[in-house]
């Protein structure tokens, strides 16, 4: 099975996610214990229960340890990139002290669309009563977006829905391992990669959210205060977006305490570093870096 998410808790525990993309996935979330994969929090939770879809992991794309004793689990509920199973998409908080699910955040139909693919998540506890979560919708069939979740009451809403900055660049044709990358359909025909908003990172002070479509080399940012402000319509919100330049084509991103952004460059088997002053450089290049995705620091 192919891992897409990796995260390390404040106590050094390592967790990995395996979305169901066609491989034989025995469990979609695991903890690495003694160099072995162990279903987390247990095997039962990793078995799809159609009678209780909110209490099980269906196809997890991202896991994020918050450094405060919680593992956040983002369940696409969309195995094989299918339409999300009705009522299955969710954000789950797991207590790392008890290894029990503490809270489940589900989404209404106007937030998780039939085309939605929940990709990655960032958490900020400094705003609101209990904090906010920011999630990328990396749909390749519908509008991309950033989904905002109020962690106090579970309310969620889509922002920059279908905006050009959350949408795949139609002029972008990636080259990976020296070859043009295209979709190949079951009938043998090829089509362009159209994956929308994917990579996401938040600044150390929580005031800036960085994001990028997967089918693009561009990096964007937006102030999180205006992103959360529902009184600002998307038609106006887009004017607050800042274009930060070409960083290379990325899947995942992360920021550190010094305000530096680290982003994968899957076309060049590299990791890029973007300094607060906007300077960009490559810090690692290796043929072993095949499609660098999730980062954890």
Region locations from a protein language model:
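Blade-loop segments of beta-propeller domains
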Residues: 28-80, 84, 89-90, 103-111
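Beta-propeller fold detector
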Residues: 35-46, 102-107, 156-174, 229-243, ...
């Amino acid at each position: 099975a192919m891992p897409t998410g990796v995260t390390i808790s404040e106590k050094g525990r390592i967790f990995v996610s395996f979305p169901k993309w066609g491989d034989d996935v025995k469990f979609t979330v695991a903890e690495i214990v003694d160099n072995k994969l162990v279903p987390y929090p247990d095997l039962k939770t990793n078995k799809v229960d159609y009678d209780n879809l909110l209490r099980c992991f269906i196809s997890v794309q991202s896991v994020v340890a918050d450094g405060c004793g919680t593992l956040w689990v983002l369940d696409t509920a969309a195995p094989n990139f299918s339409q999300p199973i009705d009522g299955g998409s969710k954000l789950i908080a797991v207590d790392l002290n008890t290894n029990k699910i503490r809270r489940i955040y589900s989404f209404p139909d106007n937030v998780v669309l039939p085309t939605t693919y929940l990709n990655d998540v960032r958490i900020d506890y400094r705003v609101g009563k209990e904090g906010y979560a920011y999630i990328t919708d990396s749909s390749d069939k519908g509008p991309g977006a950033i989904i905002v979740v109020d962690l106090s009451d579970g309310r969620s809403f889509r922002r920059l829905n279908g905006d050009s900055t959350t949408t795949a660049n139609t002029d972008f044709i990636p080259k990976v391992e020296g070859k043009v990358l295209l979709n190949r359909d079951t009938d043998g025909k090829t089509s362009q990669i159209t994956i929308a908003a994917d990579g996401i990172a938040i600044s150390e002070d929580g005031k800036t959210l960085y994001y990028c479509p997967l089918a693009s080399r561009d990096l964007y940012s937006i102030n999180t205060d205006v992103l959360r402000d529902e009184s600002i319509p998307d038609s106006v919100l887009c004017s607050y977006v800042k274009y930060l330049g070409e960083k290379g084509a990325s899947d995942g991103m992360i920021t550190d305490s010094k305000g530096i952004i680290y982003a994968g460059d899957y076309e060049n088997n590299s990791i890029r570093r973007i300094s607060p002053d906007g300077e960009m450089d490559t810090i690692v290049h290796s043929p072993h870096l095949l499609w660098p995705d999730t980062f954890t620091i």
